[in-house]
Curated annotation (Swiss-Prot):
GO terms for cellular component: cytoplasm. It catalyses: adenosine(2503) in 23S rRNA + 2 reduced [2Fe-2S]-[ferredoxin] + 2 S-adenosyl-L-methionine = 2-methyladenosine(2503) in 23S rRNA + 5'-deoxyadenosine + L-methionine + 2 oxidized [2Fe-2S]-[ferredoxin] + S-adenosyl-L-homocysteine; adenosine(37) in tRNA + 2 reduced [2Fe-2S]-[ferredoxin] + 2 S-adenosyl-L-methionine = 2-methyladenosine(37) in tRNA + 5'-deoxyadenosine + L-methionine + 2 oxidized [2Fe-2S]-[ferredoxin] + S-adenosyl-L-homocysteine. The gene is rlmN. Residues 114-352 form the Radical SAM core domain. This is Probable dual-specificity RNA methyltransferase RlmN. Disulfide bonds join C121-C357. Its cofactor is [4Fe-4S] cluster. One of its GO terms (molecular function) is metal ion binding. It comes from Corynebacterium efficiens (strain DSM 44549 / YS-314 / AJ 12310 / JCM 11189 / NBRC 100395). It comes from the Bacteria. The lineage of its organism: Bacteria, Bacillati, Actinomycetota, Actinomycetes, Mycobacteriales.
């Protein structure tokens, strides 16, 4: 049996990129412009280009003095990431991009187009330190936290793609690589930039942003106190501590009861329904009695402020884990609903391009070895 990986909460400091416009406060931006000999009002112009027009190259910002554009680019807009692989599925409605960062680490984002919306799944860390055994990213370990700029620029890239198609990016889910609440300050800063109206941000509604977590209970409570209305998604995966200690090792630190108590605090503070993510794994966590227990615990802890998303597992190559058969999925849904908790099977757009978190990066790394 493979030795379990240790939990890693503190990311290595190495490899962080040069400061980007999105990393800086307004005061820091004004100071940087002043050092370039540019007045304060240029900040508003640059912000409107970046957040409003989705431009990241000052050479195209024609209302800036021509002589200053290269200096602004060097000082505030370093190249953060380059696409090295793009894979499409679902009649090109799902697009997964593998990005190489300045230090060679990899991250992924997935753009999913639906008839009524466009959703971007973004990464908050390069790798992940939560060590969940059925997750490709968790088994790869944590390289480092992403900077605010690296998180925000995933959104700008996708928003620009949708704009070029005559559409609009409407939803953001922090469900890519990494544990968002383990990179807390940067994720919260990124959420504020994603949701503030132009020229301070991209103007996406907070209610259209989902932040996921494997259950860092103190950070869930801290997020509740930020007075934001983003959706909280808790990756629970089983209702009992005995199995969750194995599937989600952070459960050894914060139990199911502690996580659900923190989720209730978030629901009470935000007024938002909490989403419970549950990856159905054949013969591991898909038993009917676990569905009953899940529904009972969620109804007791969260009442009407909860919804269960069942996720058919995306098996990783060589893994012992496999997805539950459809009939067992349907039975699980029926039994959770019978406990008074809404439950649906999540659409698995992009399954054929390994759209589960970390799988494209894992494939790339194995090809390089």
């Amino acid at each position: 049996m493979a030795t379990p990986l240790p939990l890693v909460f503190s990311a290595p400091k190495r490899g962080m990129p040069p400061a980007h416009f999105a990393d800086l406060s307004d005061e820091q931006r004004i100071e940087a412009l002043s050092e370039l000999g540019l007045p304060k009002f240029r900040l508003n112009q640059i912000a409107r280009h970046y957040y409003g027009r989705l431009e990241a190259d000052p050479m195209t910002m024609t209302d800036l003095p021509e002589a200053a554009r290269a200096k602004v680019k060097d000082a505030l807009f370093p190249t953060l990431m380059e696409p090295i692989r793009v894979v499409e599925a679902d009649d090109e409605n799902t697009q997964k991009t593998l990005w190489k960062l300045h230090d060679g680490t990899l991250l992924e984002s997935v753009l999913m187009r639906y008839p009524d919306r466009a959703t971007l799944c973004i990464s908050s860390q390069a790798g992940c330190g939560m060590a969940c055994p059925f997750c490709a990213t968790g088994q790869g370990g944590l390289d480092r936290n992403l900077s605010v700029g690296e998180i925000v620029d995933q959104v700008r890239n996708a928003a620009a793609t949708m704009q070029a198609e005559g559409g609009r990016l409407s939803n953001i889910v922090f469900m890519g690589m990494g544990e968002p609440l383990a990179n807390y300050k940067r994720v919260v800063s990124a959420v504020r930039q994603i949701t503030q109206p132009s020229p301070e941000g991209f103007g996406i509604s907070q209610r259209s942003v989902t932040v996921s977590t494997v259950g860092l209970a103190p950070a869930i409570r801290k997020l509740a106190d930020e007075d934001m209305s983003v959706t909280l998604a808790v990756s629970l995966h089983t209702p009992d501590d005995e199995l969750r200690d194995e599937l989600v090792p952070v459960n050894n630190r914060w139990s199911v009861a502690e996580v659900l108590d923190a989720a209730r605090y978030y629901a009470d503070k935000s007024g938002r329904r909490v989403s419970i993510e549950y990856a159905l794994i054949r013969d591991v966590n898909d038993q009917g009695w676990r569905a009953d227990m899940l529904g009972q615990k969620l109804h007791k802890a969260l009442g009407s402020r909860v919804h269960v998303n069942l996720i058919p597992l995306n098996p990783t190559p060589g893994s012992k884990w496999d997805a539950s058969p459809r009939e067992r999925q349907d039975e699980f849904v029926r039994r959770v609903i019978a406990q008074g908790v809404p439950c649906t099977v999540r659409d698995t757009k992009g399954q054929e391009i390994a759209a589960a978190c970390g799988q494209l990066a894992a494939e790339e790394n194995s090809e390089e070895k």
